[in-house]
């Protein structure tokens, strides 16, 4: 068995350079980790040292890890400062919208010496670790400018004293000297002005400037783009003689920095001045640099005298391709990996509390250090600022972060029982500070403490280890630093909400509970809460109606209700207790385009998480979420006291009338009711704006008079025709913003008492714009009226609807609203309503800027729209109906949800469907022309309807335009899963697309291999291979060219992946972005179950997020994985249009995607909550335009194909999309209609009348479609495209793609407003350097040389694969070797399929494996890892075996150590894994058929599992078996703590009593011991009778009757297991 060293990293890590920056030769050794972002220019600057490795030349060329030696003097001629001919700094425009678009993620870590002994080794190791995280960072369009990297350390005083001596300065007094690391303006004149301002303020504050130092940098190592914006980098040394306390000195330096920032804010160069650090304790070196370039750029870091006892390092991946130098990290306190989802609300609230933030330590100087946030900064920078003010005010870093980023302390049995004081701490601060919510691994230091904490959901990886020589390490990945395993005494990971802190002063390490218990003991928080907080107890619902029926009807009409709202929303929620589900998409006009009046809420679309942060599952992970609300004044967060706890606590924001009355009785709140009616007797013009002014003034007066509760109410004893109500959302937003601007917002809460709120979207809007709670009195009255109606009573009596009492109906409604709110929060990845409140996470379509600025400040509104007067008139259009003489006795049906004649226009209407069916079935050009005419005559429905084509060319003959057969190759169909639609529909669409050379999409759920070969047995249109289809031809092939990888990973096997032309990662879906899905058991037929590796009738849940995509670098990793197994398939990423999508798309392009698909909100779906269909996602016109233009501006457009979908129906739509930048065009609903869909809109019921969206065989038999119908449709569309191109004078689509100058606004009048602004759609930033055809024909993006290439280069391995032999091989591996074995598995799968390989490839790996180790493993592959692994082990494996064991000589107990990372076995469809140690979060998530044994796990073990078997021989985290609908789990419970950790919604918990179950458990443990040498497993087997009763078996309903789970099965005398009848 040959030993081959495939990675030089272990050798490099043990190498110590003999001289660093010595006088004769300046060699600097780094671990150069290359990825796709490595430029040829950089590689030319590096020369490999072949003597350091025994690797072959082919191995040396591998870029995943290359040892490099850089001769700095000879190659670069380094001088102290090289800023020759710097280009002018490009201005960075930033505002609140910028902050929402400046997203990113990273790789981070720290090294700390417990003895607090400074050394250069710490710095060097930190740089090596940083180099090993290059793959977690991003590069700019030049492939050379890093998105950012940096290092924080203690101040290297000995190093600086050498410089001081050279400058004839006295040695620095460590205690009284501060050091500033400063980015200064590029321009020399401005730089001198900046330095003068700095010196003047230091002098004014009594500080003495000791000297300025130009930081020596190596300019040529900087990428081209980064060099253009590179600042002057200098250090300033100042003496602080008036203070002796370190804390006072740091505070004085903080004041100086804030004064400097304020002083330069109005200067033209003000944004170019930035303090990386100004401290007596720490210093930060950072910049727009790649990982390996940091130490090469900053020559200081190479000097042996640069010593520190700790170092925090950070590598940034920004979605913004033009990141700024100041946004590199670490910040001044924090290094952040993740994204704060609530940043806009956090900034608003920080601004609000500025007036109240006071602390004695500031001696009255608080005004001088404001503001505490900066909208021009990133979320990380603002979180750092919030932590900084708290720390400088006297909090410890640990305490500050517990306040800012609290853990999910509710539903936490360990905390509540063992550490109640920690719960009290969190409860106290919950009312004072909203959580900064979102994925976050935060590393922190103030120079005395260094530590790390993780967000409440545990969404970023964090591993830590401690050694016997007193070093502590934390990192995003293991294997980044050279450590002797024999010295490692502790290995672990940070779980959700956990923290670790190293006290450098006292040499102590504090793990999670130790830290929190210590911090929580500082004050008697529990006592303060008990004595001051009031809990609003549940108040009974009213048992009868308050209003007469006529009065209810009038109120409903006045406030904008329709019969659909009452029947399909309110009554449905009252009856079912959940939000109603609907299907298809939102095909009515946007509210601003509609000819009908809309409620104000309809102009707002909910924003959602995609790529840069994940959505949350509110149903299965509700333990981390909370709707709790605190009412009352929020105190001064900087000074503690019992009075801050004086608030009223609500369990949720939905108040019934009685609860509101109780709240109004609270004497401490001093509630004030403010009426929201306005007077139109003097005319409509100006009336609404004037009323808002008076309302805000009244709110202002009330708060200044001591009111802590403002109730904005539209309740009235009698409605009056001339006194309509201000839309309650407008009132709430205006008051909220007014109080913020006047420094009063923290003094009072806002409650809406309103008739104009009934849907979950309405509640979300009110809370999102500032309301803490809502009393929906008219909706509750409507529930009561419904329950008391004769019709409802009769339905209940007949069993048509559930029987509920009047109180239960209102309770159901409230329950549904709360559940809907949780879902809306979770779409954005937000866990707490308190963080959502005021966060304004919406996008506005159709409101004017004056309205937005007053009430919805900072919200994105790109197309402007209604003015205040126009909004007033729209409000009145509802109001007058209530007082009209011809008012009907029933509510009007507006037709907003379902199509109805005379109602709102639906683009997918019956007439359109009939016309299309006639055209494609009769193959009639005339009929298609009628269909075209129908579309052209429709009302304005979408933004593109406001545009038309223009041209500067003369028309040309159609014959000169590219042929239809070329155009149709740009067409694709939507990702509709086999399960949501029938087999007949799915296959007919695929065959049609293959006939024309287009691409169909498999959707989620896999694909039958029978479809991958052309048909050869067709007779008279029928084939025995596909007997359920007609209209077939020999040569037809039913494979989907695009194979989808969705969050459930159903049907995703190695063979499925290698048989794809393209692989689509569905991040979001237009009709329900931010949500997952569930295929009901009734739709899971035997055929569907087989494809999805499940059982018939078992519900199959797709999680809201991909559990291997929590950030942008995670997406890059999945793209890498897919390119690994199928290097010939282009990888597409499907996004949904929303503001900021351009920067997200930039990150996706930098992540090596080949295709980016932009979906509009009007796309279809098989099933979704109505609120999601109607109120989430944006128009693709805006999303596509932003994406195309952002990619061009950042030099990335040539890298990716842009595809668009959502409501496309015609050639006009195709050409509009082309002019806005799309290369390819997707059709979903129209493809289904062309194949037979009649738009019955009952897809979610499984009752489709024509079998298009049903799994019922009798309905599927009615399927009318043939592939030829869809072929005809697309050919007609292509011919339409040709005709218009000819009229415009262009020869091909290539000629017009991205040419927005060919569009102009139509001369058209809208009913509501003439103030829409389409300039954004018509703007242009140029076109790509390559044509669309050239972009589409580019080769698949490559991963570059990888470890698997070296394995496959071994002739013995290839021989074993080709001839099904056995081969064994040992390979070294390190963390940069990612997706190891994925490509080998792909080669085998392509040749043999998922189960056909009879040989064996046995690989042993030595070291720390990178992410996705053993991904997509295939039967016959057996891999053993001696070492440890990072996240995603066994992802998508279909067979084979993975064994992970620690090295032989270790200093820790294996079963107590973490050996594999998070999200292992994700989507596995077979195989086994045995790990001697613990796993991280979400072990076996969505496991289908794999078996596993592990010795402990984090939270969410076995989540969404549908099959297989998992054995855990140690402790598990919370929420085990959430969403687990199949498979079995055996969990050892040695200390009787397991049961509270089980999610019991689905699974049954029982002891192991079935003989087959015992046999299964024991056999797996025996295999585990044999393969890993597990001492824990051996002990269990040796004492089996003792341990067996300690195991719990988790059994979902689908497994209850299996031999392993049912005691009804017994073992016979022959050893067989048989069923024992009663």
Swiss-Prot record:
Residues 1-105 form a transit peptide. GO terms for biological process: L-glutamate biosynthetic process; photorespiration; response to light stimulus; response to sucrose. GO terms for cellular component: apoplast; chloroplast; chloroplast envelope; chloroplast stroma; mitochondrial matrix; mitochondrion; plasma membrane. Pathway: Amino-acid biosynthesis; L-glutamate biosynthesis via GLT pathway; L-glutamate from 2-oxoglutarate and L-glutamine (ferredoxin route): step 1/1; Energy metabolism; nitrogen metabolism. GO terms for molecular function: 3 iron, 4 sulfur cluster binding; glutamate synthase (ferredoxin) activity; metal ion binding; mRNA binding. FMN binds at residues 1184-1241. The keyword Plastid applies. Binds 1 [3Fe-4S] cluster. The active site is at residue 106. It catalyses: 2 oxidized [2Fe-2S]-[ferredoxin] + 2 L-glutamate = L-glutamine + 2 reduced [2Fe-2S]-[ferredoxin] + 2-oxoglutarate + 2 H(+). Keywords: 3Fe-4S, Amino-acid biosynthesis, Chloroplast, FAD, Flavoprotein, FMN, Glutamate biosynthesis, Glutamine amidotransferase, Iron, Iron-sulfur, Metal-binding, Mitochondrion, Oxidoreductase, Plastid, Transit peptide. It is found in: Plastid, Chloroplast stroma; Mitochondrion matrix. Residues 106-505 form the Glutamine amidotransferase type-2 domain. PANTHER family: FAD NADPH DEHYDROGENASE/OXIDOREDUCTASE, GLUTAMATE SYNTHASE (NADH). Involved in glutamate biosynthesis in leaf. Required for the reassimilation of ammonium ions generated during photorespiration. This is Ferredoxin-dependent glutamate synthase 1, chloroplastic/mitochondrial. It comes from Arabidopsis thaliana.
């Amino acid at each position: 068995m040959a030993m081959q060293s495939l990675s030089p990293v272990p050798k490099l890590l043990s190498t110590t350079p003999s001289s660093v920056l010595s006088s004769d030769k300046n060699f600097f050794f780094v671990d150069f980790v290359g990825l796709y972002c490595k430029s040829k220019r950089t590689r030319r600057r590096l020369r490999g040292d072949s003597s350091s490795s025994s690797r072959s030349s082919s191995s040396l060329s591998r870029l995943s890890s290359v040892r490099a030696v850089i001769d700095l003097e000879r190659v670069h001629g380094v001088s102290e400062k090289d800023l020759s001919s710097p280009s002018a700094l490009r201005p960075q425009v930033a505002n609140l919208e910028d902050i929402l678009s400046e997203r990113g993620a990273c790789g981070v870590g720290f090294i700390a010496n417990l003895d607090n002994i400074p050394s250069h080794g710490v710095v060097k190791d930190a740089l090596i670790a940083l180099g090993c995280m290059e793959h977690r960072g991003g590069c700019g369009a030049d492939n050379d400018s890093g998105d950012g990297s940096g290092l924080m350390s203690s101040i290297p005083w000995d190093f600086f004293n050498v410089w001081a001596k050279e400058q004839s300065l006295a040695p620095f007094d460590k205690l009284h000297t501060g050091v500033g690391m400063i980015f200064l303006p590029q321009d020399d004149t401005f730089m001198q002005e900046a330095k003068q301002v700095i010196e003047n303020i230091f002098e004014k504050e009594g500080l003495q400037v000791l000297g300025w130092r130009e930081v020596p940098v190596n300019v040529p190592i900087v990428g081209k783009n980064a060099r253009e914006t590179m600042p002057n980098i200098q250090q300033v040394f100042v003496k602080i003689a008036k203070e002796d306390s370190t804390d006072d000195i740091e505070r004085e330096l903080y004041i100086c920095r804030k004064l400097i920032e304020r002083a330069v804010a109005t200067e033209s160069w003000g944004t170019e001045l930035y303090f990386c650090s100004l401290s007596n304790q720490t210093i930060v070196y950072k910049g727009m640099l790649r990982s390996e370039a940091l130490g090469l750029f900053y020559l200081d870091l190479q000097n042996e005298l640069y010593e520190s006892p700790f170092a925090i390092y950070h590598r940034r991946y920004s979605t913004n391709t033009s990141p700024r130098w100041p946004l590199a990290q670490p910040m001044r306190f924090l290094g952040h990996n993740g994204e704060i989802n609530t940043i806009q609300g956090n900034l608003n609230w920080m601004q609000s509390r500025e007036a109240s933030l006071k602390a004695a330590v500031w001696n009255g100087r608080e005004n001088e250090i404001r503001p505490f946030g900066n909208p021009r900064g990133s979320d990380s920078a603002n979180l750092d600022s919030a932590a900084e003010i708290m720390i400088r005010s006297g909090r410890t870093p640990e305490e500050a972060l517990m306040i800012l980023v609290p853990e999910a302390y509710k539903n936490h049995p360990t905390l509540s029982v063992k550490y109640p004081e920690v719960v009290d701490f969190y409860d106290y601060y919950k009312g004072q500070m909203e959580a900064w919510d979102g994925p976050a691994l935060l590393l922190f230091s103030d120079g005395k403490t260094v530590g790390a904490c993780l967000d409440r959901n545990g969404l970023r990886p964090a591993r830590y280890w401690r050694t016997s020589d007193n070093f502590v390490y934390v990192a995003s990945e293991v294997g980044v630093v050279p450590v002797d395993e024999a010295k490692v005494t502790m290995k672990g990971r940070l779980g959700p909400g956990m923290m670790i802190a190293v006290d450098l002063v006292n040499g102590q390490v504090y793990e999670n509970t130790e830290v929190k218990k210590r911090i929580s003991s500082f004050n008697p928080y529990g006592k303060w809460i008990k004595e001051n907080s009031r809990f609003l107890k549940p108040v009974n619902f009213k048992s009868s109606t308050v209003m007469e029926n006529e009065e209810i009807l009038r109120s409903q009409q006045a406030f904008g209700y329709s019969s659909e709202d009452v029947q399909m929303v309110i009554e449905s929620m009252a009856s079912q207790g959940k939000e109603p589900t609907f299907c298809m998409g939102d095909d009515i006009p946007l509210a601003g385009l509609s000819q009908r009046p809309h409620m104000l809420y309809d102009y707002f679309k909910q924003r959602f998480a995609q790529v840069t942060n994940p959505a949350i599952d509110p149903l299965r992970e509700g333990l981390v979420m909370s709707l709790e609300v605190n009412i009352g004044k929020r105190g001064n967060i900087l000074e503690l006291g019992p009075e801050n706890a004086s608030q009223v606590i609500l369990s949720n924001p939905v108040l019934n009338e009685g609860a509101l009355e109780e709240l109004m009785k609270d004497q401490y709140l001093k509630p004030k009711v403010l009426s929201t009616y306005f007077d139109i007797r003097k005319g409509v013009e100006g009336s609404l704006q004037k009323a808002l002014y008076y309302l805000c003034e009244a709110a202002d007066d009330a708060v200044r008079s001591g009111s802590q509760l403002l109730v904005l109410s539209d309740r009235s004893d009698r409605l009056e025709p001339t006194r309509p109500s201000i839309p309650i959302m407008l009132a709430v937003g205006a008051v909220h913003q007014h109080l913020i601007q006047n420094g009063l917002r923290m003094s009072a809460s806002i409650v809406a008492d309103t008739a104009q709120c009934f849907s979950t979207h309405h509640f979300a809007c009110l809370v999102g714009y500032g309301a803490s709670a809502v009393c929906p009195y008219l909706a509750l009255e409507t529930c009561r009226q419904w329950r008391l109606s004769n019709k409802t009573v009769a339905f209940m009596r007949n069993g048509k609807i559930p029987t509920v009492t009047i109180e239960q109906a209102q309770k159901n409604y409230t329950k549904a609203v709360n559940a809907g709110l949780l879902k809306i929060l979770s779409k954005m990845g937000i866990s707490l309503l308190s963080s959502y409140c005021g966060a304004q996470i919406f996008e506005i379509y159709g409101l004017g800027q004056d309205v937005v600025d007053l009430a919805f400040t900072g919200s994105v509104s790109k197309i402007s729209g209604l003015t205040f007067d126009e909004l007033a008139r729209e409000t009145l259009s509802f109001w007058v109906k209530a007082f009209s003489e011809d008012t009907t006795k029933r509510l009007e049906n507006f037709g907003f949800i379902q199509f109805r004649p005379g109602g709102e226009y639906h683009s997918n209407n019956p007439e359109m469907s009939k016309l299309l069916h006639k055209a494609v079935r009769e193959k009639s050009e005339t009929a298609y022309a009628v269909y075209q005419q129908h579309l052209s005559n429709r009302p304005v429905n979408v933004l593109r309807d406001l545009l038309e084509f223009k041209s500067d060319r003369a028309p040309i003959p159609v014959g000169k335009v590219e042929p239809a057969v070329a155009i149709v190759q740009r067409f694709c169909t939507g990702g509709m899963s086999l399960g949501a639609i029938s087999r007949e529909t799915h296959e007919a669409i695929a065959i049609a697309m293959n006939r024309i050379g287009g691409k169909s999409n498999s959707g989620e759920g896999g694909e039958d291999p029978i479809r991958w070969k052309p048909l050869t047995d067709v007779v008279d249109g029928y084939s025995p291979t596909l007997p359920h289809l007609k209209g077939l031809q020999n040569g037809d092939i039913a494979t989907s060219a695009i194979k989808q990888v969705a969050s459930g990973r159903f049907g995703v096997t190695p063979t499925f992946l290698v048989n794809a032309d393209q692989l689509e990662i569905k991040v979001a879906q237009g009709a329900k972005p931010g949500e997952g899905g569930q295929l009901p058991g009734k739709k899971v037929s035997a055929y569907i179950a087989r494809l999805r590796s499940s059982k018939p009738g078992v519900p199959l849940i797709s999680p809201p997020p991909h559990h291997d995509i929590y950030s942008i670098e995670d997406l890059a990793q999945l793209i890498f994985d897919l390119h690994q197994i199928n290097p010939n398939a282009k990888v597409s990423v499907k996004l949904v249009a929303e503001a900021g999508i351009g920067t997200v798309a930039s990150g996706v392009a930098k992540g090596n995607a080949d295709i980016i698909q932009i979906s509009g909100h009007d796309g279809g779906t098989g099933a979704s909550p109505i609120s999601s269909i109607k109120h989430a996602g944006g128009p693709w016109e805006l999303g596509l335009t932003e994406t195309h233009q952002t990619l061009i501006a950042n030099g990335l457009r040539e890298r990716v194909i842009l595809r668009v979908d959502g409501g496309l129906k015609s050639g006009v739509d195709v050409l509009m999309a082309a002019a806005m930048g799309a290369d390819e065009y997707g059709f979903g609903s129209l493809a289904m209609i062309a194949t037979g869909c009649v738009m019955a809109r009952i897809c979610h019921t499984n009752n489709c009348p024509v079998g298009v969206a049903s799994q019922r065989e009798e309905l599927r038999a009615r399927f009318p479609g043939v592939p030829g119908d869809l072929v005809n449709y697309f050919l007609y569309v292509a011919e339409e495209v040709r005709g218009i191109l000819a009229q415009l004078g262009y020869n091909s689509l290539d000629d017009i793609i991205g040419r927005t100058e060919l569009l102009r606004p139509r001369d058209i009048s809208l009913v509501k407003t003439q103030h829409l602004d389409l300039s954004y759609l018509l703007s242009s930033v140029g076109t790509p350097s390559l044509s669309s055809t050239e972009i589409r024909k580019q080769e698949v993006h490559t991963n570059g040389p990888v470890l698997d290439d070296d394995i496959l280069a071994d002739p013995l391995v290839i021989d074993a694969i080709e001839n099904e032999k056995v081969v064994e091989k040992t390979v070294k591996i390190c963390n940069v070797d990612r997706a190891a074995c994925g490509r080998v598995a792909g080669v085998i799968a392509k040749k043999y399929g998922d189960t056909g390989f009879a040989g064996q490839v046995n690989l042993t790996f030595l070291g720390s494996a990178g992410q996705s180790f053993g991904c997509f493993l295939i039967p016959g592959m057996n891999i053993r890892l001696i070492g440890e692994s990072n996240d995603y082990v066994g992802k998508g494996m279909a067979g084979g075996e993975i064994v992970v064991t620690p090295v032989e000589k270790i200093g820790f107990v294996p079963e107590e150590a973490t050996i594999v990372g998070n999200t292992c076995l994700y989507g596995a469809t077979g195989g086994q894994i045995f790990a001697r140690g613990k796993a991280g979060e979400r072990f076996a998530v969505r496991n289908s058929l794999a078996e596993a044994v592990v010795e402990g796990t984090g939270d969410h073990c076995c989540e969404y599992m549908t099959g297989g078997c998992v054995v855990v021989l140690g402790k598990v985290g919370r929420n085990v078996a959430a969403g687990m609908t199949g498979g079995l789990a055996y969990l050892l419970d040695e200390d009787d703590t397991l049961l509270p950790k089980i999610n019991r919604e689905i699974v049954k918990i029982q002891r192991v009593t079935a003989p087959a179950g015992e046999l299964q458990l024991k056999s797996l443990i025996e295999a585990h011991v044999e393969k890993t040498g597990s001492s824990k497993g051996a002990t269990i087997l040796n004492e089996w009778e003792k341990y067996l009763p300690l195991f719990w078996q988790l059994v979902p309903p689908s497994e209850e009757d299996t031999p392993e789970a049912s005691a009804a099965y017994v073992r016979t005398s022959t050893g067989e297991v048989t069923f024992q009848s009663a």
